[in-house]
């Protein structure tokens, strides 16, 4: 379970960078005293992007863990999945 490079990582990084851009926009909007509706909309976009990235990362990691169980590492995989479950 030491290899934490997954095929989905570039897509996840892209989503997180998009969220980072949205968050920077939200900060600018706050400083410009934009409307609460506009701010809420952008905050929702940030939240959605982060949730989507987290979900994709967790799903990909579960698949990776299941592949490890096929290789005989079931006890350590179970422990890691239990740790991961608290973030769902």
Give the predicted meaning of each segment.
Residues 1-88:
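Solvent-exposed interaction patches of small proteins and small membrane subunits
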